[in-house]
Amino acid sequence: MLEFASLGAFQNHVTQTMIPAVHSHLGRGLEAAAELIQNTARAKLGHYQSSVEHFPAWPELADYTKADRVAKGFTENDPLLRTGALRDSIGHEVHGFEAVIGSTSDVAVFQELGTNKIPPRPFLGPAVVQNEEALRALWHDVLLRGFLGRGSASTTQMTGARLRDGD
C-alpha cells in the first residue's frame, strides 16, 4: 500500500501517475468503442433492419431497384449492399478524446437520412443505440481500471470491442 508524507506528495502521485493512466485508458476505450460501432454499422448492410428507438425500420426495396440489381449482376434483395464499397467506406478516427465514426461515401448520407426519392435506411445511428449496454460496460471497465492503475486484461471482450495491454 502506498503511503504519502504529505498531501502535496499525494497530489504529485495523482498528477504524475493516476491522471496519465486514466488518460491512457480513456484513449484505448474510445478506440474500442469506435471500432465496436463501426463494425456493427458495417454488419447491418445487406440485411433488413427493424426499428430502433427513433430510427425507422428499413422498408422493402422497390421492385425497380430489385430489377436493376439483378440486371447488373447483384443479388436481388440485399439492401445497401452491392459491391461492398459502402460497407468498406465506414470507418472511424480517434484523436485525443474525440472519435468520429462515419462514412467517406456521399451515398451513406442519402441512405442514413433518406431523400425525397429514397426512404431512410439508417445504420450508423442504430449501431450506437444497439450497443448501449456494451458501451456502458466498456466505459465502466475503462474508468475503473484507469483509476485503480490496472492494465486492461487482454481477454476483455465486449461484443467485438477489446482493450489490449500496450495499445
Predicted regions and their residues:
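Short, Lys/Arg-rich flexible segments
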Residues: 1-167
